[in-house]
Amino acid sequence: MILICSFLLWSGIFPKSDFNIYWFVYSQTASYVITLIIAIYIVLKHTGKLTIKFNFPFVLMIIKKSLPYALLVLLMSFYNRLEPVLIERILPKDISAVQAGIYARAYRLFDAGNNISYLFSVILLPLFAAVIKKGEDLQTLVKQSFGLMLTMTCIIAIVCIFYSQNLMELLYTIQDNESIETYNLRITESSNILKILMGSFVSISVTYIFGTLLTANGNLKQLNIVAAVGVVINLTLNFIFIPVFEAKGAAMTSLCVQFATCAIQFFIAKRIFNLKLGISFWISILSFIILLVTTTSLLKSS
């Protein structure tokens, strides 16, 4: 999809002014079809043939075992992506679209960073599962993955916080018939929301560590309860914050929900696996964050 969209945007064959959401939909559909064809080719190359048969008892068993995972994904999707919808539904019509757009501009960077953390969790799942199955010690793997995730996400978050205004100006230009005052106000609001969402980014990235650990251990009941609590907190705070703070209220809600679910999952994993990260680990993380903030601040002011 990246290659197709890049070709459409920068090849010079197609005018950029003609690019619209339909082109993106067509590009995404084409990329899925190409991926499917490649996947089928690889399977056929290794198996020689592909026969499709339906074994209904087996299918029902798979569905039954998959339901807790499906419910978890559904609940997490609710409290991760409800904000733009609620902004449009809760705020008056004359400002809802504008505020949803302001939130979406900052959310795109949050979502991009979130994909990096998600890929990290995909790698960790089989590692955690293998260690748990063998009955080996998890302390080292959890500590290393947790430290690596915190280091990576803190760097991204702090850089985005300090340079939020610059990033918004780089990504979004002034629109036709828009005054410079309106543009600056829109960019400032989006940059302030980005700062808050970067706190959510760190929290959700930590969730990918301990949520993945609990998933590998089969603790789906606890994870679904945590996700359900997250949905309740999300809805409650959004209905309180959005009417008062508008798009910024949605970002504040996201921060609260992600931090709450992150903390709960951490303590559940700590209790189940008897995790002991040690005071030296937390001191090293805190020292790194202080050094990173100081360095970024000096670079920003120079």
Mark where each language-model region is.
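Membrane-interface junctions at transmembrane-helix termini in multi-pass inner-membrane proteins
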Residues: 1, 18, 195-229, 240, ...
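Hydrophobic alpha-helical transmembrane segments
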Residues: 1-45, 229-233, 247-268
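Transmembrane alpha-helical segments of multi-pass transport proteins
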Residues: 4, 8, 12, 230-233, ...
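Alpha-helical transmembrane segments of multi-pass membrane transport and lipid-handling proteins
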Residues: 7, 116-117, 139-203, 235-239, ...
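Helix-terminus/linker motif at the lipid-water interface of multi-pass membrane proteins
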Residues: 12, 16-17, 74-112, 127-130, ...
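Interhelical loop/hinge segments that connect adjacent transmembrane helices in multipass membrane
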Residues: 13-25, 39-80, 127, 132-137, ...
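Alpha-helical transmembrane segments of polytopic membrane transporters and translocases
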Residues: 68, 84-85, 99-117, 147-151, ...
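Helix-loop junctions and terminal segments of transmembrane helices
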Residues: 110-146, 211-216
